[in-house]
């Protein structure tokens, strides 16, 4: 034996010791190796502001399980880790900290702020990386990247410049999503929607001479000062005579035209819609079609500007109250209705987002989306589960241009340089900062804005491998293999990686997207600070161990679906760890320092053939499950095989032989135990890396590390289907006899004769398994026969797959006393049935009791009736 196992398993000691060894030995490191197939996963980079939560724990457990599986299958595996600069989140955090010190970022300036931000990143940015190590993540930490490191910045700048030169990046004054709190633009994907109870205000717009009027319904009366038209459907006969005429904006007094546009739904409200091009994306498009003026009335911080007079200086909500009151006085407010609608909020601060026009940088997405759609349609990129194709297509088919500029300082600064000569006005977009304007020679200054975080994250699969340089890693590992991610960032991240991969590299970024859901609490609620139901993975690891947490996450998760997490599942996983550990100690104690040879196939008995056949079958099934990303199914199969078939059955079958006198049989049993335990540890390793390494290293002939050991393969050498089926039949008999003994209160130490009535063709199996029947069923003798002749009167029986098993009771228990006891139980159960039936038959109880109480009473009645039937059957058996 290479090492002796202590009496109890100390996960803290094992995990810290093994992880340090793994990293020191370079087991996680990957190199371009033409002799092996590459397999690469890029880690979804967690924000540097974050700390490990259950979502990270699930995401990285799944990735690590896949990587460890592929590594054991001979692939050159690269799991490339890194962190995201998280532009808005990080800047908000640093600004908040500075505010506590009484410092405003604008007072210290950009350079000083960025210096502070980099210091903050150095101090806190590695926290989550340390926590990922605690999970057992086998990342190649030598290749760890950061979305704002020098290499990523070069890639981001080059992509921006190249797309700009192709006309796919442009600057324009367009409608965007604006967060007045974060003070920055947001992309469509960064806006979340919440249903809010509000109102629908019906407002009358009068003709200049009051000769006609038109009524519009709006959810945002505060935007009325920015109205530039009223739109009606061209097919709406009610307004045919009014198209081309004008009305007056209430309170403001400005004349605006009535235009015809198919965007308007005749059936909604009055069929007339006020058009505010600067504050609604649909209105903006109507404004473009009809060449309407643009009047922006909101400031960046959510107040009314001078064009919003007479409400200048008010917040949007203050303006809403004021203009509604003014329209009531003027008679323009027709009615107010209660109305629930979706309101956009910032995905970071959750404050209301304002649609408004602003001069920003955009990516033209429709031309880029075509190839990104094709590669999924044609199966080059597969989503697992496949239903997420629909989610992806819904986004891509309706994609709009992406606003990529952010009014922040922390991030990749836009590589655009503006000539300061007002007569020139040239904009130079270039990789290298120009010293002067290339057109007129005047001074230039760089754009103040930074790029959307997801712009740089979209290049993660190739920027991390060295692009734009042609590195050996890029050549070998790109396209990467599998992306593991939550369904909540398919729009944010997955779609954009496919867009950038197909455009920049001319190749897909990965061939499979394995999608998982979110981790919810035991009640199915999303974990949140407000609910106080968050669970700290590090606390779970401290109490139960990383393996227990990992196993509970893998077995509780199915692809694409949310999962419920509870400590009970972790406790069950810890119990499994203890079961595996104790079984391994048993094997180790019985092997000692012996040299263990190969299995002698000529000396296998029926139990040996059964366990080797089952090991072989499980290895094949688990391999198929892993290849199909059915990780939860694979983990559960390994669990069930180890717990039930190996520990509960084969080890118990092996014990008499280990202590027997046949030396060659003892040696063969030991060889089988070592083989089955070793292969079981390999099958379990992707999910529980620490305990499997520890136990594997306790076995003779163990390789340097289990993570580089060969994955168990299905082999014809261990195909014993016939013997395995026969052994399963014998085990069914043993289970039935155990159940009979328990039902009849036969003391465990009392041995009994067993009569087995079975067809003649089954007799050899019972002869081969006679020793196991006698030990595991508590039998003193096993009589196998084809009929019921000679079976003692009063014997109890159980029907099994291979026939019928009988055990006589007369010498095992005092039958008269047992009859007396059973009769007492029957009377008690009859009383319980009568009580429950009386209660449920009482109209007063049924009318007044809560449904839950009634259902509980019905359940009690069902249980009592079932127990009564069993007791009466037992009494009949006892009475013969």
Question: Positions of the model-derived regions?
Answer:
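Residue patterns forming the tRNA-binding/recognition surfaces of aminoacyl-tRNA synthetases
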Residues: 3, 8, 17, 21-25, ...
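Short, solvent-exposed turn/loop segments enriched in Gly/Ser/Thr/Pro and often Arg
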Residues: 34-36, 44-45, 78-91, 144-152, ...
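Conserved phosphate/anionic-ligand binding catalytic regions in large, soluble enzymes, centered on
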Residues: 51, 214-232, 348, 354, ...
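Secondary-structure transition/capping motifs at alpha-helix termini
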Residues: 68-76, 97-110, 130, 134-139, ...
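Feature 926 captures the class I aminoacyl-tRNA synthetase adenylation module centered on the KMSKS loop
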Residues: 202, 394-455, 459, 503-546, ...
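Protease-associated
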Residues: 210, 214-216, 221-275, 279-285
